[in-house]
């Protein structure tokens, strides 16, 4: 540790000199607003003007308003459905050149021989996938703009998810990949959770929902969510995030994986209509989702200790052997019209391991 700057009117002491390297050392990202990158048009995001950003040891840039599109990709000609993209500000290496913006699938630094972790800085990102068209209040509309008017269920598009755009200052506490902003300092996964292969969970397009088939119950869902910095939602958080998801159908999977003839879960994010106003997929149907709310069976009368929690986890004092219940939301693959954004089942106990119950996660803002 030592003094970085001193006053020396003769400038003979190196510590008196203000250099780019010193400014880079002390500069974070200084922005007038947390959301210094925003969705601005179909296939485009805009970096706002006036942010000061250090890149590596030799560059400090002040941003101008800049629109970024697929033309900024480091590889490929267009965005890919179901992919997370990362936005980098890059130092081209000479004092005469301004910053360069690159959009990449890589989460470390962009592709290309000239780029590495010394001359690039990740400043944000977004997800490209299914978006539900809404009015200014977030209500689903049909192609004529009528709220829940005829045919509203199919009025979706493939685009940058506007509420998936994140920055270093506007993001969840966890990895922001595969998440959208729900408002009120809360983020939610875009996809029902699948197994990340490391005893945690992930939100990815075309993933297989994790359920009791992989040993999931309410307790394990919470443990896996915690390992990746997330948590289970309560019922209100779930219904808000799921709003705009069409009600299920008995005889069709057009609005979600809900037809009563279905036999099992399916890959997430594949049904065009099955997206909420917050651009979250499969909230109605496919598998039930564990919620962070409990209740007790009011009809029980046989109060006692019940050894139902599994070996080594203690016992539950209840009015019957399944007295404690955990809510599950949304419906599953064969529930038909029972599926929906407010659908709830109050009969499942938290130690239940069921092939039709999965999990969807949220995370608080950083």
Where are these regions (language model features)?
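Short, low-complexity N-terminal tether/leader segments at secretion or assembly junctions of large
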Residues: 1-25, 115-139
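Glycine-rich, flexible loop motifs
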Residues: 26-83, 92-93
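Residues within well-ordered beta-strands of beta-sheet-rich folds
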Residues: 86-90, 187-189, 279, 360-364
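Acidic glycine-/aspartate-rich tracts in secreted/extracellular proteins
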Residues: 91-97, 192-195, 293-296, 333, ...
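Short, surface-exposed terminal/edge motifs of secreted or surface/virion proteins that either
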Residues: 93-110
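Short aromatic-cysteine micro-motif
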Residues: 128-281
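Disulfide-stabilized, aromatic/cysteine-rich ligand-recognition loop
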Residues: 214-216, 311-366
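A short, polar/charged loop-to-alpha-helix boundary motif
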Residues: 297-310
């Amino acid at each position: 540790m030592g003094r970085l700057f001193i006053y020396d009117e003769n400038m003979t002491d190196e510590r008196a000199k203000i250099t780019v390297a010193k400014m880079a050392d002390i500069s974070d990202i200084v922005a007038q607003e947390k959301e210094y990158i925003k969705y601005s048009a179909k296939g485009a995001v805009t970096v706002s003007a006036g942010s000061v950003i250090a890149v590596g040891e030799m560059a400090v840039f002040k941003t101008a308003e800049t629109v970024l599109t697929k033309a900024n990709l480091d590889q490929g000609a267009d965005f890919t459905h179901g992919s997370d993209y990362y936005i980098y500000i890059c130092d081209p290496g000479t004092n005469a050149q301004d910053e360069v913006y690159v959009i990449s699938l890589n989460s470390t630094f962009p592709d290309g021989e000239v780029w590495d972790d010394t001359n690039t800085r990740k400043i944000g990102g977004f997800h490209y996938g299914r978006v539900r068209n809404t009015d200014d209040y977030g209500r689903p509309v049909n192609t004529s703009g009528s709220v829940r008017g005829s045919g509203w269920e199919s009025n979706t598009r493939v685009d940058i998810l506007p509420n998936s755009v994140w920055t270093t200052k506007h993001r969840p506490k966890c990895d922001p990949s595969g998440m959208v902003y729900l408002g009120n300092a809360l983020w939610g996964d875009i996809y029902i959770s699948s197994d990340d292969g490391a005893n945690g969970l992930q939100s990815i397009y075309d993933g297989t929902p994790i359920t009791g088939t992989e040993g999931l119950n309410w307790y394990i869902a919470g443990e896996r969510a915690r390992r990746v910095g997330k948590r289970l939602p309560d019922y209100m958080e779930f219904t808000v995030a799921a709003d705009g998801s069409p009600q299920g159908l008995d005889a069709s999977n057009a609005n979600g994986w809900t037809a009563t003839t279905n036999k099992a879960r399916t890959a997430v994010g594949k049904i065009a209509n099955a997206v909420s106003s917050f651009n979250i997929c499969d909230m109605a149907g496919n598998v039930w989702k564990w919620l962070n709310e409990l209740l007790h069976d009011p009809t029980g009368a046989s109060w006692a200790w019940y050894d139902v929690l599994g070996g080594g986890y203690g016992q539950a004092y209840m009015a019957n052997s399944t007295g404690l219940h955990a809510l599950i939301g949304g419906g599953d693959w064969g529930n038909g019209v029972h599926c929906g954004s407010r659908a709830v089942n109050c009969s499942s106990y938290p130690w239940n391991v069921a092939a039709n119950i999965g999990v969807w996660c949220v995370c608080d803002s950083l």
